[in-house]
Amino acid sequence: MRLIMMKVSAYDLNKIAEKLNLSIKDLNKAFSRKILREDEYKEIKTLLFKKEFKGIEKGTVIFLNDNLDVVRGYPKTYRAITLYPTIKKHFIDKVVIEEKLNGYNIRIVKIDGEVYALTRSGYICPFTTKKVKKFLNLEILDDYSEYMLCGEMIGINNPYTPYYYKEVDRGFENLGFYIFDIKERETNKSLPIKERINLCEKYNLPYVKPLAVVDKDEAHIHVREIIEKLNKEGREGVVLKDPDMAVSPIKYTTHYTQCEDLKSAFTFFFDLGMDFLFSRVVREGFMSYEFKETLEERKNRAKDLGEAILLPMVETINKVASGERVSEDFELIFDSEEDFDEFLDFMRKMKMVITIKNIEKIDTEEGVKIKAVIGKIYNKTNDKIISYLNGTLWE
């Protein structure tokens, strides 16, 4: 069989296959299907799994260095649609309840003496890499280079999932990182929760603190109470974990989050609407059933859902009708114009259609910063609205 060597011909594909516990045949199949692709960051060459393949997680990265260092992709966290009996069936004994933060998933690693922050998809994000170096004491990766720090970057000033958190407000910037998992980066094995917490406290690293530790037989009662409290506070939800991480975590989100997701999706409804709609409405239906809502409570839930869908949709149509090209806007803070330009290059590399809406220098207690508003354009939504407003028929 002819091997697909590409630009990685300088590297031993047999060793790469061995590292991943794959056959050469499977490795070439991943190349030919464009599941395994090349990437580069500041002349650091990597291979990246764009999809799950033969047990290798999406977002898994192989650094093409002498060691062929592997960073496994973060596994998908499955969702509980019902609290009971799902939690009782899934867990062994005790259940650790942690808050689910509304941000973007990042893995922090140290390879050949350099720190990198990888997105869920496996790209080295220059914006996030610079921020975690600034925010965190990363000496832990000097002592435990085999680990990856898995966590959530949260705050309104982030380029992927902007949402305000008062606990990460720094005056001129609302951004921060919380660790929710520490894994062996080549095996994806998680540390037990107590061990992870001890390490975070030893190195003074911010981490997601457990809200409760409960017996699995009664966990559904406690989770519901916590979910109702988080819903009132406008928070996202919970992640449920085994204390030893012996079984995979599961998640459960609030009514508030479902509605906020729909609002975001139906602002750009021709691009995102269908992908978001069905799953969230199903979650709401099962939540209404399990929480034994009265007819009045159910009608209120339905009203919330309807408003989350219709109001942003009509607002978008109005904006486009008045000549505006709608975009999802992010306000970001950079240390320099060079950092700003580097991030723009990264976004274009990700095939994002962007527009710079504003850029200015601001004085902070840390010196002069660059504040930029970047708009992500959803062409399909803009173009289809214009088309239908001009009389095109729905096919």
UniProtKB/Swiss-Prot annotation:
Question: Which CDD domains does this chain map to?
Answer: Adenylation_RNA_ligase
Q: Which residues cross the membrane?
A: none
Which SUPFAM superfamilies does this one have? DNA ligase/mRNA capping enzyme, catalytic domain
Q: Which InterPro entries match?
A: Lig_Pab1020_C, RNA_ligase_dom_REL/Rnl2, RNA_ligase_Pab1020
**Name of the protein in question:** Uncharacterized protein MJ0414
Q: Organism, per UniProt? A: Methanocaldococcus jannaschii (strain ATCC 43067 / DSM 2661 / JAL-1 / JCM 10045 / NBRC 100440) (Methanococcus jannaschii)
